[in-house]
Curated annotation (Swiss-Prot):
UniProt GO BP: NAD metabolic process; NADP biosynthetic process
HAMAP family registered for this protein in UniProt: NAD_kinase
A matching Pfam family: NAD_kinase_C
Protein name per UniProt: NAD kinase
SUPFAM superfamilies according to UniProt: NAD kinase/diacylglycerol kinase-like
Homology family: Belongs to the NAD kinase family.
Compartmental location: Cytoplasm
Native organism: Ralstonia nicotianae (strain ATCC BAA-1114 / GMI1000) (Ralstonia solanacearum)
Amino acid sequence: MTSRANATSPFKTVALVGRYSAANIAAPLLELASCIAARGHDIVFERETALNIGVQDYPALPPDEMARHADVAVVLGGDGTLLGIGRHLAGASVPVIGVNHGRLGFMTDIPFEDVHNVLPDMLAGQYEAETRSLLQAQVVRDDETIFSALAFNDVVVNRSGFSGMVELAVSVDGFFMYNQRSDGLIVSTPTGSTAYALSAGGPILHPALSGLVLVPIAPHALSNRPIVIPHDAEVVIQVTSGRDASVNFDMQSLTSLLPGDRIVVRRSERTVRLLHPVGYNYYATLRKKLHWHEYPTEDNRL
């Protein structure tokens, strides 16, 4: 649920994280650092960001240490950048502010051109806050966990690009749900419901909802439809056939799943706290990002 903060003491130490693989990211990041420092805040850069853009005037720390020293993290990039740092900060008391320097920007919802107007007030303690859930998943082979990871958006089991459909047996809370022949299956958080799950035909879940959504990817049976399940459910996806299937945890991948492998997915106890400008509204974000308020013109442009 989104809540408005009362006036509190300003955040003292601000961590900066950037989409350092993007062209021309150094100048806006350094501009942002100067703006924040000029208002009396201490600055620390995420280490990979600092190394890749050549930061020398500010200290740099790896994400785990950054979480211990910073009071808030400001992410300049797209949603993918925020997903990555969000996993590192999950469970820590460091909230995250997203400034868009990517494309769509559902979570990095502050346009860079507006940052000088809204960020000072947010760092001074005036913001809207919400808590987002994550997924915890393990890959189990012969009763041994061979891989585990957190996912902010989704856990996706995919067929190989060189083979046909993958066959999956899906159970929820120990109860068999179905066998499925498809290109894969998405297990999504409410946050991830506006990502891959949406493009695969899944519903949008408001972030305040306590639920998970299972979305088949191009299922062979048209009756295999998306389903929303309780947030505390445990989902087990067993690969029954299919060559070189893979599983993706947001942007982290494990390839070459074997028949018999089980992917166990449940809601993580860790959460991420996102901060937005005062007046933030989720429905306005959907309307803007998905162009709900626009209609095609005669030349088929929005």
